[in-house]
Amino acid sequence: VWLLGSSLFSAQLAAMLGLPFAFASHFAPDYLMRALEVYRAQYRPSAAWPKPYAMVGVNVFAADTDDEARRLFTSLQQQFINLRRGTPGKLPPPVDVLEANELELANVAHSLSFAAVGSRDTVRDKLRDRIAQTGADELIITAQIYDHAARLRSFELAAQIRDELASERR
């Protein structure tokens, strides 16, 4: 059993119950670092989990080039903008230019600021930084990519990156 949350309360609850904690930083990064700090500081060991164990969520959009990955990422950006406008719907196809005002662009950039978007090397470096920044024991990744083949390619690249980063930690 895990506790998934995006608040300080969820971090406190996971700590109190001696559960592993997954933080939803893939859409709510604001309290990530403080939540991990609270979780680790207040952790009460349990029989199954003698020490705190943290996972953080990351949107991963990996492609053969940074430009291609940034274009794929526009689907998720549009979805967030549409949600904030009160017009939720299916994941839209990627676009060359986002149709949004400055405030909407700033809000979506903030909400998705923990994402790793780019080529294999760019994403690897970003994920390495995210692990170092958070001290996460695991990452849970998601990729809301419109095109199925591009989504599969992103996960293939992510798996290669996982293997490379795991070998660095040994």
Q: Where are each of the predicted segments found?
A:
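Hydrophobic faces of well-ordered beta-strands that scaffold small-molecule active sites
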Residues: 1-4, 21-24, 52-59, 139-141
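Generic C-terminus detector
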Residues: 131-170
